[in-house]
Amino acid sequence: MKVTSLCYMLAATTVAGTAAAQQDPSYIDTSYGWRPVLMEIIEVPVSLKDAMPAGEQMARRHSGLSTAPAVINQTRSRDEDTGKAPCHGWRFLPSTPQKFMPYLDALFVPGNTCVEPCGIICQDMVSTGAQKIKRFLSHYGFQYDLTMSYNYTAIHPRTRHRNDFSSFNHSLTGTWFLAKDCDNSQGVFLTMEADWGQGTNFSERRSSAQSSLGSLCNPQGSLRGGKGVFLPQLALGYSGFDGKWVAMAGTLDVSNYLDQNAYTPGWAGGLMNQSFGSNPALLLPWANLGFLTAWQPCENFYAMYATTSTNTGVNQNPFSDLSANYWMHIAEAGFIMDDVLGMGAGTYRLQYTMIDHGGDMGLGFGLNLQQQVGKNSPLGFFTRVGFMDQDAAAATGTKAAATAGLMLQAPFRKSGWGSRSNYDNVSLGFLWQRAASSEKPMANKDEYGLELSAVVQVTPTFFLQPDVQYIFNPIHATDKDGAFVLQMQGVFKF
C-alpha cells in the first residue's frame, strides 16, 4: 500500500480539529498537550508576564503527543523571512526552529516556556529569573528542559540492608538549533542531555532501594548519580522535507525518542518507578554511539528506527570497546488517532527489536498505547507490554513485562490546586516482570508492583510529589515477600 493511501486511511478514522489563528498574541496554556487554550490575562502567572511577552512565547511541548496547531503557529508566526520572496540562504542560530511534523515537533522542540499556571503561588523570583534565562537563550537557538530535584526514599518494613535514601538528582535535555533554511523546510541541530546526582547519605553507584529490596524493577527512577556529570546524549541532527524526516548520529539516549507515552512522563511528574518510564523488557540504551531516524509522512502515522552499541559505560569514550557482538536495532511504528470508538484521542505503538549480546542474536517486540477514557477527559489509560527471547532478555534481565495504569490530569477541580497546571495529577500503576534466566539464582520468577503518586504544583516552576509503592515478590529477595517504598520529592522544572 502506498504511503499516501495509508495516511488517508488513518486520517479517515479521526476527527479533525484545529485552533483558530489569533490576531493579537496571547499566552497559551498547553493543558498537558491535549487541549491548548488561550489564557485570560488574569490567568497568566505574573512570573510569565514579567519575563516574556506573549508574542515571544513558544509553549512547552509534551512528549508522546502531537504538538497542537495553535502551539506550532506560535513558532511559525515569528519565523524570519516568512512571506518574503525570493527566499535565499540559511539562518544561523535562529530564534525559532525549522518545521517539524507535529509528533516529531514534541520530541525535538522543547519550547521556551517553563512557567506554568498555578493556583497556589503565581509569582516568585526563581520562576521569573528562570523564565528570563530560558527566553534569552532561545534567541540564539538553544531550547532546553532542566529538572532539579530532591528525593527522600524509605523502605518499610525494614530490610537487612540500607532502608532510607536522601539524594539530589538533576537532568538537562536540550536542542540547539544551529542553522535552518530561510523557508524553514530543513535545518541542522545539536541534541544533548547531561545528568548528575548525589546521594547525601549513600553512594548512588553502590546502593539503592532496588539493591536493598533485591528487586528487578527500580523504584527510584529519579537516581541520576554517576561519576560526576555525564552525557547520555550528544548528537548532531538534520531535519528536512518540511519536517517529515529527521536523522541523528552521535551519542544517543534512545529512551528520549522511542517508547514515549503521554500518561507516563517519567520520574519527575509521573510514576516514579523506572519500569513505568519505559518498557522494562526493551533495551533502550543511553550514552552509546548510534544512529536514529524518524519519519512522519502525515499527522496520523510515524515510524522510527535506532541502532546503537550497548556496552559503553558511564562517562566512557563512546568509540571505546565498539563491537558487533554488543549491538541493538529497534524500530517503532505509531498510529495517532483523534478519536477511538468515541473514547477520545489515542496513540498505539508497535516495536520490534534485534539485540546481539555477547555474540548471541535475540529478538523481541513491544506494544505501547495511551488512550483517553472519554472524549476530552482528563482521565487517561496507558499500558506497555514486552516479550523477549532468552538471548535478547540477557541484555535487560527481563524476559517479559507488562505495565498498565491510569492518570487523572488537571483540571479536576474548579479552583485552587488541580484546577490548571501541566503537572498536577494523580496516577495509579501496576507492573509485572518475569526475570530472564540470566538473573539466576533468584528467589522468585515473577515480580509485581503497585504505585500511587500525586503531584501538587506549588509555584510556577516547583511541585511536590508524594509517592507510595508496594513491590511483591522481589526477584532476588530471600528474607521477605514484599515491602513498601515511600518517597517524597520536590522538583524544579525550568
Feature map (PLM): residue ranges:
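Short loop/turn motifs that connect adjacent beta-strands in outer-membrane beta-barrel proteins
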Residues: 80, 86-92, 118-144, 177-190, ...
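Residues on the lipid-exposed face of transmembrane beta-strands in outer-membrane beta-barrel proteins
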Residues: 146, 170-178, 234-238, 291-295, ...
